[in-house]
């Protein structure tokens, strides 16, 4: 519905997907980005999935917006130390991030189960 609206109007949707990995205990909620990546500016963070101290977020832009972003806001520099970026990249590349998310989901599901008599 949102995707159709954005496509019809040539508009973009800003989707802040903070906490998406744990907002649904049994399955991740489908994002608008997954349906219409060409119409969505997707924003997310690693502070819930890894640790609150991991103050690292990211933004995925539709291809037509990348050059405009770089022209207007390219002067912004990344404030995340390079070492943390490398560690995070390896965490993702190795599959450990996905395993971490799955472990946390299992723990949350276990916690959400009603107590047995």
Language-model features: where?
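Proteins with a high burden of low-complexity, intrinsically disordered sequence enriched in S/T/G/P/A and R
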Residues: 1-2, 18, 112-117
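PLP-dependent aminotransferase class I/II
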Residues: 41-116
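Active-site pre-lysine segment of PLP-dependent enzymes
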Residues: 1-9, 19-49
């Amino acid at each position: 519905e949102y995707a159709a609206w954005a496509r019809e109007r040539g508009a973009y949707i800003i989707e802040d997907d903070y906490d998406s990995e744990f907002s649904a205990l049994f399955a991740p909620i489908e994002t608008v980005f997954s349906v219409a990546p060409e119409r969505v500016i997707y924003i997310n963070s690693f502070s819930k999935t890894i640790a609150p101290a991991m103050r690292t977020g990211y933004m995925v832009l539709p291809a037509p917006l990348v050059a405009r972003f770089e022209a207007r806001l390219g002067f912004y520099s990344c404030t995340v130390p390079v070492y943390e970026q490398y560690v995070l990249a390896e965490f993702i590349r190795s599959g450990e991030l996905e395993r971490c998310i799955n472990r946390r989901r299992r723990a949350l599901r276990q916690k959400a189960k009603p107590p047995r008599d």
